[in-house]
Amino acid sequence: MSLQNNEQLDQLRHSTAHLLAAAVMQLYPQAKRTIGPSIDTGFYYDFDFGQDKISETDLPKIEKLMRKLALTWKGFVKNELSVDAVKDEFKDNEYKIELIDEHSGAGEVLTVYQSGEFRDLCRGGHVEEPNKVLKYFKLLSVAGAYWRGDEKNKMLTRIYGTAFFTQEELDQYLYVQAEAKKRDHRKLGRELDLFSFSDMVGSGMPLYSPKGALVRRLLNNFVEELQSEQD
């Protein structure tokens, strides 16, 4: 993929992160949004849902609203505002205020982008016609994430998704991910009764079942035989 295409894909995915935030804020108006970047595999957005709890069972309704909103988004409108004006707009969101304080200086102008009725603090990098290209996306999972990646901060809810320019690209990505899950050693170990994990001994320390211990011993013997043949 060319550098230009990479940039376009980043813009598409970041734009879809905006769309995700818009849908979440409409469904959960008490939630507080934080950041939503594009990443190598798609995008994510972190939220503080307060007393509300969401899981992957909530993703279909969020995605459904995203598709509905996307049809109404004709573009991303850039608004250049003073630091004070942006602080006033996001005064009820301590996460945005923290970001504003970090990236603002005396007399500096910040940018807020708007699509439809949704506005978000953002430096830019979006698609030009969201209602035409924000079509081929999928919300994938929900996870916990500390604000700013610091375990001393509050645990937020991170929603992951991915987006492409065509249905074929999206289908191919989802197929590859599904096949990878089938071959996940943690999944296979559990299903084949080879080993398990326990938080009591550490997440990276497998506990072998008798069957798993036998397989490991046979593999070790096989490797030793190969090494002896090469000596």
Model-derived features: positions:
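Auxiliary tRNA-acceptor-end handling modules of aminoacyl-tRNA synthetases
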Residues: 1-11, 23, 28, 32-38, ...
